[in-house]
Amino acid sequence: MQYTEVMVRYGELSTKGKNRKDFIGRLAGNVTRALQDFPEIEIHPKHDRMHIVLNGAPFDKIDQRLKLVFGIQTYSPTIKVEKNLDAIKKASLELMQATFKDGMTFKVNTRRSDHEFEYDTNQLNTMIGDYLFDNMDNLKVKMKKPDLVLRIEVRQDAIYISNQLLHGAGGMPVGTAGRAVMMLSGGIDSPVASYLAMKRGVEIDMVHFFSPPYTTEKALAKAKELTGILANYSGKINFIAVPFTEIQEQIKEKLPEGYLMTIQRRFMLQLADRIRAKRGGLAIFNGESVGQVASQTLESMVAINDVTSTPVLRPVATMDKTEIIKLAEQIGTFDLSIEPFEDCCTIFAPPRPKTKPKLDEARKLENRLDAEKMIQRAIDGMKITPIYPNQKFLDDKAQEDADLL
């Protein structure tokens, strides 16, 4: 089926009042980037919807990109025809023949913004319905919740016909809620938290801590490749690799075992906050879920959050692990997240970490270390890599090795 355009309907943009124009402009830019491999298309954002003129581009390939763009509620592949009855009949029949299957029910739903058109909505519904019955077999009408709705929109410039209502990613266009940093590990939770942050319109920079030689290049490559999967939903993401070896070694050497995780997380949060400030971010996101591990009890969060006044947001805070896994599978990060490359959160994990660390004790222990100089050395050693949708960093040999573990 050769469609002429795609009609895109906005989601929460309709509630944004005076900022609506800016939100629509951002969405148009995000759609343009997502479809940059199709130079023939034209994108026309309007107040109530967006028209993507295909000019011969295949809808099935456009569909694969469009469904990942946040800010789109629904969209429909559409045929645009001249404002005459024969053209409407022909396009309606083509659409129904391409999508109708035996046993399906349907109805015709006409809307007019051009009230000067010669036929009203009831007349068009009846005439097109009769024409379809005369030219197709096994049609059944159902007025409430049919399988197919043939939508005919009579506008000033033309008539638009569609019979599919496809669901988009919802949410807000990435970039409309400002910039933040995401503390990305190689696990299941933080990629899901990243997805949810972007869905609310946040443009994120990934901050990943690595500790060579305890963590391998493969672990770093895994985190980058996870970022490449997430970039499908936002376009390019900056990946910031922060060396963490010295800090971890000093903590392990000089501090009691029970507080290793607490102090380590305090350093991570301080580093993330410094990077946020340098890059103009407004918040810090992470993948913590309340009570899931020792560092994610409320007492631990109090002892760790003490190092910053910046908002620390946790999109998966109240989700069960099974809920997080289900979403990870849906967004395409789960299989890579469970590849067994150790990250810096696991290499020095004590057997009995404090689940209720005391804030005063955490402060006192951290003061035994030369925190400021170590933080600055880590900042000086960080590396920023732009990562693009589906960019690969793990070679086939690395994947084979992981499968054997």
From Swiss-Prot:
Top-rank lineage group of the source organism: Bacteria
Principal place of residence: cytoplasm
GO biological process, one term: tRNA 4-thiouridine biosynthesis
A Pfam family it matches: ThiI
Species whose genome carries this gene: Lactobacillus gasseri (strain ATCC 33323 / DSM 20243 / BCRC 14619 / CIP 102991 / JCM 1131 / KCTC 3163 / NCIMB 11718 / NCTC 13722 / AM63)
Keywords: ATP-binding, Cytoplasm, Nucleotide-binding, RNA-binding, Thiamine biosynthesis, Transferase, tRNA-binding
PROSITE patterns (UniProt xref): THUMP (PS51165)
GO cellular component: cytosol
Binding positions for ATP per the UniProt entry: M183, L184, H208, F209, R265, G287, Q296
Originating gene: thiI
Catalyzed reactions: [ThiI sulfur-carrier protein]-S-sulfanyl-L-cysteine + a uridine in tRNA + 2 reduced [2Fe-2S]-[ferredoxin] + ATP + H(+) = [ThiI sulfur-carrier protein]-L-cysteine + a 4-thiouridine in tRNA + 2 oxidized [2Fe-2S]-[ferredoxin] + AMP + diphosphate; [ThiS sulfur-carrier protein]-C-terminal Gly-Gly-AMP + S-sulfanyl-L-cysteinyl-[cysteine desulfurase] + AH2 = [ThiS sulfur-carrier protein]-C-terminal-Gly-aminoethanethioate + L-cysteinyl-[cysteine desulfurase] + A + AMP + 2 H(+)
Annotated pathway: Cofactor biosynthesis; thiamine diphosphate biosynthesis
Family (UniProt): Belongs to the ThiI family.
Family annotation (InterPro entries): Rossmann-like_a/b/a_fold (IPR014729), ThiI_AANH (IPR020536), ThiI_fer (IPR054173), ThiI_N (IPR049961), THUMP_dom (IPR004114), THUMP_ThiI (IPR049962), tRNA_STrfase (IPR003720), tRNA_sulfurtransferase_ThiI (IPR050102)
Enzyme class: transferase
Protein name, entry field: Probable tRNA sulfurtransferase
GO molecular function: ATP binding; CCA tRNA nucleotidyltransferase activity; tRNA binding; tRNA-uracil-4 sulfurtransferase activity
Function summary: Catalyzes the ATP-dependent transfer of a sulfur to tRNA to produce 4-thiouridine in position 8 of tRNAs, which functions as a near-UV photosensor. Also catalyzes the transfer of sulfur to the sulfur carrier protein ThiS, forming ThiS-thiocarboxylate. This is a step in the synthesis of thiazole, in the thiamine biosynthesis pathway. The sulfur is donated as persulfide by IscS.
Subcellular location: Cytoplasm
Presence of the UniProt keyword Metal-binding in the record: no
Domain THUMP: 60-165
EC annotation from Swiss-Prot or TrEMBL: 2.8.1.4
Claim: Repeat is one of the keywords in the record: no
